[in-house]
Design a protein with these regions (language model features):
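Membrane-interfacial amphipathic/re-entrant helices at transmembrane-helix boundaries
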Residues: 1-24, 38, 52, 60-65
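Hydrophobic alpha-helical transmembrane segments
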Residues: 12-15, 44, 64-72, 94-97, ...
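Hydrophobic core segments of alpha-helical transmembrane domains in multi-pass membrane transport
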Residues: 18, 25, 50-54, 104-108, ...
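Alpha-helical transmembrane segments within multi-pass membrane transporters and channels
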Residues: 61-106, 249, 254
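Helix-loop-helix "hairpin" substructures at the membrane interface of multi-pass membrane proteins
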Residues: 139-217, 240-245
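Cytosolic-side transmembrane-helix boundaries in multi-pass membrane proteins
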Residues: 175-189, 260-308
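Transmembrane alpha-helical segments in multi-pass inner-membrane proteins
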Residues: 213-277
Length: 308
């Protein structure tokens, strides 16, 4: 075992790529939860985005068209979820779980003929001047457009929620939908839009997995990424900046354990594979304990149905 074999610049660049699907899916879920809706169907939306994006990417020969298809597929599934919980007034938790099971099954059926096929590639984009900086350039400025989009989206969501009137309205609905309704805000319509955005982002995250991260279709390839995205929203305290940090920590642990396996570290492979998930559980436990002594960051109406 020789730790010097691990290239730090490549390690950081790899963790950014590994974290991107989580950033996208978790960012969408953060907006959904800020509106007062708990969507446990993120995993299902991600896997549908992954298979739809892969199929369209392979058939058209364009990974970018595949990414658009992934976003549309995730948004379409999220509209079904929105209709069930907002119009039919079904339980949010049960509906989200059912949607995840449905998504996993449908994706397995759709993707079966495409197993083992390689997807079209998304090329990396080197930012002029910045990419030439030694070490730092390789780590941060030689990535594909989806990575850059995820970073812009983090800032965009923060700005929307904290600086734009529409974002403040969405937050007010999440805190107390009855008061927001009494002030004339259209609770159902705004939640529909938030859920659709969340589904599209989850779909893009799934598409990134099958078109860039792997890149091929494998049944169940999300491997719990949707659940990790849900955990990251809680970890972040419903703040986009901390969400990005949490995703990069998880991605870093994931890539580090793969590198440790590659250099033959004397630790059981099963333990190394569990490390990212154990770290997530530990972080959630620590956050729960700390919040016993402070203010909870969750929206006041999170998970509660709105009845006119």
């Amino acid at each position: 075992m020789d730790l010097s074999e691990i290239n730090f610049a490549i390690l950081v660049a790899s963790l950014i790529v590994a974290s991107t699907p989580l950033v996208l899916a978790a960012l969408g879920e953060l907006v959904v939860e800020k509106s007062g809706v708990l969507n446990l169907g993120v995993e299902g939306m991600m896997i549908i985005g992954a298979v739809s994006g892969f199929i369209v990417g392979v058939e058209t020969g364009s990974a970018y068209i595949g990414m658009i298809a992934a976003a549309l597929a995730g948004a379409l599934l999220s509209l079904l979820f929105a209709f069930i919980i907002l119009v039919m007034q079904a339980n949010q938790v049960a509906s989200g779980l059912a949607l995840t099971i449905f998504g996993l099954g449908l994706a397995a059926l759709m993707g079966h003929p495409y197993t083992g096929i390689k997807s079209p590639q998304i090329q990396t984009v080197s930012l002029p001047v910045l990419s030439d900086i030694p070490v730092i350039g390789q780590m941060f400025f030689k990535h594909d457009l989806i990575v850059y989009f995820s970073l812009i989206a983090v800032f965009g969501v923060w700005y929307f929620l904290n600086r734009m009137r529409s974002g403040l309205v969405l937050r007010s609905i999440g805190e107390d939908h009855d008061v927001a309704h009494s002030l004339g805000y259209r609770v159902i319509s705004i939640r529909f839009l938030a859920i659709t955005f969340g589904g599209a982002m989850a779909g893009v995250g799934g598409g990134y997995l099958s078109l860039v991260r792997v890149p091929q279709w494998t049944e169940g390839m999300t491997a719990g990424a949707g659940w990790i995205a849900l955990a990251l929203v809680v970890f972040s305290g419903w703040r986009p900046g901390r969400l990005l940090l949490g995703a990069y920590i998880f991605g870093g642990i994931t890539i580090l354990q793969l590198n440790l396996q590659a250099i033959g570290v004397n630790i059981n492979i099963a333990i190394l594979s569990m490390a990212p998930y154990l770290a997530t559980i530990l972080a959630l436990v620590l956050i729960s304990v700390s919040r016993l002594h402070g203010k909870r960051g969750a929206p006041g109406c999170l998970g509660k149905s709105f009845v006119k």
